[in-house]
Amino acid sequence: ILTDGRGGTEMKIQYWLNGKVENDEIAPGQMLYDLLRKKGCYSVKCGCETTACGLCTVWLEEKPVLSCAVLAARIDGKHVTTLEGLQGEAQEFARYMGQEGSDQCGFCNPGFVMNVLAMVRELDNPTEEEIKEYLAGNLCRCTGYVSHMRVLKQYLTEKGKGMRL
């Protein structure tokens, strides 16, 4: 912990952001969301500040977390991945969303895509209930999730992950 000359303190952290080593000085109470936005990760959105919407979802050590609820100090020595670090996979899934017309206002897209990509890596042949549970933290204001499920079923089938009924 360092003093900043004004009576405050800062911490030095080192972490990997989208595969690149980063070194930063942060305030002990700084949230991961704020750090990521300062680093130019604009796919990370803040919609509620109460962990209710899922817009701020990122991966910490390959697991989805809500960056509005994680202290930046917790990423010291760890790997953080944002949508910017998953552009190839994200663009592939976004094509499915566009083809199916499931992308209306785009409010939920960042968190939804991050969770879908994490789920695809973690679960083989998920059931509809497993999918719903995995994506439960994503707030969608437009579609009621019907079109999201349709796109996800098609995506999983074409990726060879299928879906158990």
For each predicted feature, which ranges?
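Signature of N-terminal electron-transfer/Fe-S-associated modules in redox systems
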Residues: D4-L165
